[in-house]
Amino acid sequence: MSEITAAMVKELREKTGAGMMDCKKALAETGGDMEAAIDWLRAKGIAKADKKSGRTAAEGLIGVSSQGTKAVVVEVNSETDFVARNDAFQDLVRGIAKVAVSTNGSVDAVAAATYPASGKSVSDTIKDAIATIGENMNLRRSVALSVEDGVVATYIHNAVSDGLGKLGVLVALKSTGDKEALNAIGRQVAMHIAATAPLAIRPEEVDAAVAERERNVFIEQSRASGKPDNIIEKMVDGRMRKFFEEVALLSQAFVINPDLTVAAAVKEAEKAVGAPIEVAGMARLLLGEGVEKEETDFAAEVAAAVKG
């Protein structure tokens, strides 16, 4: 078993909101495995699945761009928010997003593509910007969606400039109907995705490993009731149905009209569109998601702790 350090306990507390002794016990029970410790705490009812770390995420901007029946969302990181508010950096991210639409490819494809304003590759243009602005930056993610018929709607939450912000969403809608009406429902669905962060479009598309992990947690929680195995199985099945409803886009309650599911809202929109609509794809990029940088600002750390 790996040594349980104070740093590990601190990280688990930040991720779950559980008490120090509970975190220490969870790590000891799971051999120091952080993800297993989170599940252990959840099974005991001590932590919630969606508690997020309070550590500082990478700065930068999310950019979206669209062209005809395709669109892209990119993430470009910087070291500080100050640079993210710099006009030159914003122009760079906006330009990279436009290049990404034309390449319709991965980060590597976008990085190798020519940046029109410089005549150099996007990668070399970023290097030039680093030298000029004096801060490290990188193209971290690029996701493109396209349809043969229909639209790919885009949405930036709390935009800091045209097509730029901290959270960007794409949603691809297949339809031969009216494009203006299709864009209207597409934007609403994109706003919904920004708010709820669904894991998949349909329940059956939820990652099997994620579903299995949830089932195991529910089993452990249900066993604490002391009920027979056949009752526990029914309890777990019921909780799994609710889980799929909560994390799959089409079965979620529509944030704009909670009386409808997203599927029902899209179906209702078909009247204005004049043709069937299929939700064919989605992408949601939150700035700095999954990336943490070293904390060196003691004052900021204290302020974050005070805010809870």
From Swiss-Prot:
One Pfam match, by short name? EF_TS
Q: Does Oxidoreductase appear among the keywords?
A: no
What family is it from? Answer: Belongs to the EF-Ts family.
Q: Which Gene3D superfamilies match?
A: 1.10.286.20, DNA helicase RuvA subunit, C-terminal domain (1.10.8.10), Elongation factor Ts, dimerisation domain (3.30.479.20)
Where is the stretch described as Involved in Mg(2+) ion dislocation from EF-Tu?
80-83
Q: Which PROSITE patterns match?
A: EF_TS_1, EF_TS_2
Q: What does this protein do?
A: Associates with the EF-Tu.GDP complex and induces the exchange of GDP to GTP. It remains bound to the aminoacyl-tRNA.EF-Tu.GTP complex up to the GTP hydrolysis stage on the ribosome.
Q: Which UniProt keywords apply?
A: Cytoplasm, Elongation factor, Protein biosynthesis
Q: Name one GO molecular function term.
A: translation elongation factor activity
| Protein's name according to its UniProt entry | Elongation factor Ts
Entry's InterPro entries? Answer: EF-Ts_dimer_sf, Transl_elong_EFTs/EF1B, Transl_elong_EFTs/EF1B_dimer, Transl_elong_Ts_CS, UBA-like_sf
Q: Which CDD domains match?
A: UBA_EF-Ts
The record's Gene Ontology cellular component field reads: cytoplasm
Q: What is its subcellular localisation?
A: Cytoplasm
